């Protein structure tokens, strides 16, 4: 981080229209994968006033009640009345899902599972930094925490005048690659019309901002912009059209690391846009956890229908304890980055994805979860269970 003195990242709440779309896409994926672990799923969602449109390509033996899934997601987020601008119980739901192209399928499936080809060409990045306990950049971590707290305060009734749509933005100050302060905080939250601006600002500052952000990083010079337009009553899909895959920087590292451009939500693990990005995070986090570097960004690329990555590259930004070339060699020895191996290594064939679709795919704690008869661990790419192996192999 020494190249920056200030760095800013943003996040959005689960009620943001693009995040509604992401959550619907991943809820559909979860429902299918719960019944058919070998399904091929690529689901896109659009939400706008009074309607949700679900499209894409799915090949599966499962049957799911897509309309009910869509309605449940919208209502669970908090859009349950036309008063807030969107009602999951009464909105229109359009299903225009087709089957996956056999041309793609023949390039992915193999007689030997380990030879499974990548579902598409592409490049993916993984990143980790030791600036927070979760080995994520601080600006995106704080931004996620703000909108998570907004949802918590709304759903618990702590701030009953809050509505689902919200956005956050945090600017951190760095010295010598370390976070030394927070320069600016932006939090815009949808709200009921009857609340005064003074009450809203006080409630948000005391029960959201100060509850989340470390006091030692705030100062008299920190700028706080709470609903800077003064009013945010119209929000959600009424205010803006929502689309799956339009918040890829929020989903990843807040702009601190590069992004290959492929979105995550709605895609089963055969799509390397998702699974290889998760593997990249797993590799980078274990490198940092092992003490091989303070920061690490890894790039991996694939060709459609080919199992082995076409390239693996890595940058520790001058923070490595050993050379980047040596770390790449260790990565190739310790991690198998073929698509099937990633799916096996991270145990990805479970209905774990809706939870990833809001508040970031990275920096989240693995949890044990049970769906029906299936018990599994979520956010497996956040484990640091290969750090000791890397450290030993590096001779540290």
Curated annotation (Swiss-Prot):
Its cofactor is Mg(2+); K(+). K(+) binds at residue 44. It comes from the Bacteria. One of its GO terms (cellular component) is cytoplasm. It catalyses: L-methionine + ATP + H2O = S-adenosyl-L-methionine + phosphate + diphosphate. The gene is metK. Homotetramer; dimer of dimers. This is S-adenosylmethionine synthase. CDD domains: S-AdoMet_synt. ATP binds at residues 16, 165-167, 240, 246-247, 263, 267.
């Amino acid at each position: 981080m020494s190249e920056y003195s200030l760095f800013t990242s943003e996040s959005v709440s689960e009620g943001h229209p693009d995040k509604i779309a992401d959550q619907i896409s991943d809820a559909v994926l979860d429902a299918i994968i719960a019944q058919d672990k070998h399904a091929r799923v690529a689901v896109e969602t659009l939400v706008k006033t009074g309607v949700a449109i679900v499209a894409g390509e799915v090949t599966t033996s499962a049957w799911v009640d897509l309309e009910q899934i869509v309605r449940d997601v919208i209502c669970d987020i908090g859009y349950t009345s036309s008063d807030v601008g969107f009602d999951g119980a009464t909105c229109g739901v359009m299903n225009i899902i087709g089957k996956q192209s056999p041309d793609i399928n023949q390039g992915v499936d193999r007689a030997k599972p380990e030879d499974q080809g990548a579902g598409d060409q592409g490049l993916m990045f993984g990143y980790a930094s030791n600036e927070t306990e979760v080995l994520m950049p601080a600006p995106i971590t704080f931004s996620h925490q703000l909108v998570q707290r907004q949802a918590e305060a709304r759903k618990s009734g702590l701030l009953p005048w809050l509505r689902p749509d919200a956005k956050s933005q945090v600017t951190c100050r760095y010295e010598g690659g370390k976070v030394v302060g927070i320069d600016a905080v932006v939090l815009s939250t949808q709200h009921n019309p009857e609340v005064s601006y003074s009450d809203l600002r006080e409630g948000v500052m005391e029960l959201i901002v100060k509850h989340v952000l470390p006091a030692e990083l705030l100062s008299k010079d920190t700028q706080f912009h709470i609903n800077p337009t003064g009013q945010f009553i119209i929000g959600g899909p009424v205010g803006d059209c929502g689309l799956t895959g339009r918040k890829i920087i929020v989903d990843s590292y807040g702009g601190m690391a590069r992004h290959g451009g492929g979105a995550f939500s709605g895609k089963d693990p055969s799509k390397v846009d998702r699974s290889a990005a998760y593997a990249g995070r797993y590799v980078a986090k274990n490198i940092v956890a092992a003490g091989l570097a303070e920061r690490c960004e890894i790039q991996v690329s694939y060709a459609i229908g080919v199992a082995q990555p076409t390239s693996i590259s890595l940058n520790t930004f001058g923070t490595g304890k050993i050379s980047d070339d040596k770390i790449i060699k260790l990565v190739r020895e310790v991690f198998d980055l073929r698509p099937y191996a990633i799916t096996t290594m991270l145990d990805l064939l479970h209905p774990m994805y809706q939870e990833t679709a809001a508040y970031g795919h990275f920096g989240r704690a693995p949890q044990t979860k049970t769906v029906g008869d299936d018990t599994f661990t979520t956010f497996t790419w956040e484990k640091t269970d290969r750090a000791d192996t890397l450290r030993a192999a590096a001779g540290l």
